[in-house]
């Protein structure tokens, strides 16, 4: 299993920046490339190429942070801001288009709500995961089921 060309979707979280570092280290060792994408999910009520100014600015800032993270390990990434109807489909489509060997997804650790916080789940809602459990969500689920390549998922350690 050699990752040469790697796709890393970023959202600005510390976890996604760690995924960029891991991808750069791996691709550098294998003389490959890293493609970093920030996907703006465009509501169906707007045209796909709608000008989403504030979100585009946020995406460009996050891509810039990813490029800086790559420079820390003496590597260059190719960053791209994408607009799509669905983030998960955009990630898989980008992996196909760029013919990558792997996708590295990052998930942040989210602590379940403590008992006695007064929080009540809405009717039909689900309780918080037990300690050590978490739910990846629809984007991760779709990418895991449909990616044409290997998918790595990283999670940062719990912070007390």
Regions found by a protein language model. Give the residues of each.
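Small/aliphatic-rich secondary-structure junction motif
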Residues: 1-53, 69-78
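Alpha-helix N-cap and loop-to-helix initiation/capping positions
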Residues: 11, 50-58, 128-135
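Short, well-ordered secondary-structure micro-motifs
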Residues: 19, 46-50, 89-92, 115-117
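Short, solvent-exposed amphipathic alpha-helices that sit
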Residues: 22, 55-66, 90
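Charged docking surfaces used in two-component/phosphorelay signaling
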Residues: 82-90
């Amino acid at each position: 299993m050699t990752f040469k060309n790697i796709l890393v979707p970023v959202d600005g979280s510390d976890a996604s920046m760690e995924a960029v570092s891991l991808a750069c280290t791996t691709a550098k060792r294998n003389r490959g490339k890293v493609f970093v994408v920030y996907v703006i999910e465009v509501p169906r009520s707007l045209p796909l190429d709608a000008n989403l100014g504030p979100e585009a600015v946020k995406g460009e800032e996050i891509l810039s942070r990813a490029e800086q993270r790559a420079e820390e390990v003496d590597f260059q990434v190719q960053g791209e801001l994408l607009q799509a109807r669905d983030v998960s489909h955009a990630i898989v489509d980008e992996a196909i288009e760029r013919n990558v060997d792997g996708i590295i997804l990052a998930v942040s650790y989210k602590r379940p709500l403590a008992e006695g916080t007064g929080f009540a789940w809405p009717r039909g809602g689900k309780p918080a995961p037990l300690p050590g459990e978490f739910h990846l969500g629809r984007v991760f689920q779709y990418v895991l089921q449909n990616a044409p390549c290997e998918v790595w998922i990283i999670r940062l350690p719990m912070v007390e």
